[in-house]
UniProtKB/Swiss-Prot annotation:
GO terms for molecular function: glycine reductase activity. Heterohexamer of two alpha, two beta and two gamma subunits. Component of the glycine reductase complex, together with components A and C. PB is substrate specific. The keyword Coiled coil does not apply. Keywords: Oxidoreductase, Selenocysteine. In the first step of glycine reductase, the substrate is bound to component PB via a Schiff base intermediate. Then the PB-activated substrate is nucleophilically attacked by the selenol anion of component PA to transform it to a carboxymethylated selenoether and the respective amine. By action of component PC, acetyl phosphate is formed, leaving component PA in its oxidized state. Finally component PA becomes reduced by the thioredoxin system to start a new catalytic cycle of reductive deamination. It comes from Peptoclostridium acidaminophilum. One of its GO terms (cellular component) is glycine reductase complex. This is Glycine reductase complex component B subunit gamma.
Length: 438
């Protein structure tokens, strides 16, 4: 009997190509199995083999979703696999979204079973858990020794068409799908047993867990932008040179509040990024590529907006827990309200950074202040629940393009900000991604 054919999808880091400096690499087939693919092959060697590894840079995938997916599918198809394994992505947001997108597409478009793995707080998990099997892993590559065997075991079960049990038994993230199953005891007996456990204060597990919905009403549109006070918030980690508050480069435990009164431009002499989730060179060269102080200051002088708030709030969103993101926003939103801020422009960079940003968007908007989220990976913003979303240019430079001249780049940034102001002046009843014209 021939062995089960497995294709492995991984990002540039696990392929050994490089880190953030290679995150824009286009899809390709590895000439030989990278170590992680070889480890997977060793785990399943008795009944299967990894016949090929397909690689794509995280940023390239995030910025070219449709094209990247289609090219990767063609590469996978060329191996004629029986199953596809993607990842594990742990808590790497862009990687998680890419791995889950590939997993779903392989199932839906190629008709081939597929599985991926990631940390439960990875934005890819929230986006795709209803559509794909996602094995729950630790939040970093330190968990590889447990994650890969769990994925390998599940993949073999899936490839052989064996019955798949519930999420607790099989180790995948709960999908919110109900299915019939047979139990030895009647429902009445199980219900009484559960009630007794509850009354005793013992742990029990419901058989019908309810999904959690957390949507926020969109803030009312700004009627007269020429009189509005606009504040900037970012999960992109822009801080004064030297990072005086020591905001962590990942999994931030704090945020900063910075005074920009009298500042027309965020130069490299005074500002930098503390963000560790993408190549920092572009933001360090010009922090306006992440928060558009220069353009908003021009608009303030021209009377397009009433006032740019003298403070902006910043944290690093990559790997930052949703609970922390909410806590930060709950705290500084009180100050925004007290300071009479009318609207907020919030910017984000990478995948988990976008999740953090969108989480802050919702907390700010609970106060009634309308917020527009400028982000490159817009599907994550939608999944988390931001109401007004404006597409950005690229993950490391959402409001800029280093390939342009200074004047051209600033003109591009102005178009993005104009679109953001348009969004803030538009009444919306549901989540809306405003079409880019730049």
């Amino acid at each position: 009997m021939s062995k089960i054919r497995v294709v492995h999808y991984i990002n540039q880091f696990f392929a050994g190509v490089g880190g953030e400096e290679k995150a824009d690499i286009e899809p390709f087939i590895a000439e030989s199995l990278p170590p992680v693919s070889q480890s997977l092959s060793n785990l399943i060697k008795d009944e299967a083999e990894v016949v090929g590894t397909v690689v794509c840079g995280d940023s390239y995938f995030g910025e070219n979703l449709v094209e990247a997916k289609n090219r990767i599918l063609e590469m996978i198809k060329s191996f004629n696999p029986d199953i596809v394994v993607a990842g594990p992505a742990f808590n790497a947001g862009r990687y998680g979204v890419a791995a889950a997108t590939v997993t779903k597409a392989v199932q839906d478009e190629l008709g081939i079973p597929a599985v991926t793995g990631m940390y439960i707080e990875n934005p890819g998990a929230d986006m795709f858990k209803k559509y794909a099997y996602i094995i729950s892993t630790g939040n970093s590559a330190a968990a590889m020794r447990t994650a890969l065997p769990a994925m390998a075991k599940f993949a073999m079960k899936l490839a052989k068409g064996e019955e798949i049990g519930g999420p607790v038994a099989e180790g995948y993230i709960e999908r919110g799908i109900r299915f019939n199953m047979f139990k030895e005891d009647r429902g009445a007996k199980r219900a009484v047993a559960m009630l007794v456990k509850k009354l005793k204060g013992e742990e029990y597990e419901t058989e019908y867990p309810m999904p959690s919905f957390d949507k926020v009403e969109p803030g009312k549109a700004i009627k007269d932008m020429s009189k509005a006070k606009i504040a900037i918030v970012t999960s992109g980690g822009i801080v004064p040179k030297g990072n005086p508050d020591r905001i962590e480069s990942s999994s931030a435990s704090k945020y900063g509040k910075y005074d920009i009164q009298g500042i027309d431009d965020l130069t490299s002499e005074g500002w930098e990024t503390a963000h560790g989730g993408h190549d920092p060179i572009y933001a360090n060269e010009d922090a306006d590529r992440v928060i558009p102080v220069d353009v908003l200051r021009d608009m303030e002088k021209e009377g397009v907006i009433g006032e740019l708030h003298r403070y902006f709030y910043s944290t690093t969103g990559n790997g930052t827990a949703v609970a922390s993101s909410k806590k930060f926003a709950e705290e500084f939103t009180k100050e925004l309200v007290a300071d009479g801020v009318d609207a907020v422009i919030l910017t984000s960079t990478u995948g988990t950074c976008t999740r953090c940003g969108a989480s802050m968007v919702k907390e700010i908007e609970r106060s009634g202040i309308p917020v527009v989220h400028i982000a490159t990976v817009t599907p994550i913003s939608l999944t988390v629940g931001a109401n007004r979303i404006v597409p950005a240019i690229a993950i490391p430079h959402p409001l800029g393009n280093p390939a342009l001249s200074h004047e051209e780049e600033k003109a591009l940034r102005r178009k993005i900000v104009e679109k953001a102001l348009e969004a803030l002046q538009t009444e919306v009843e549901e989540q809306t991604v405003f079409e880019r014209n730049y």
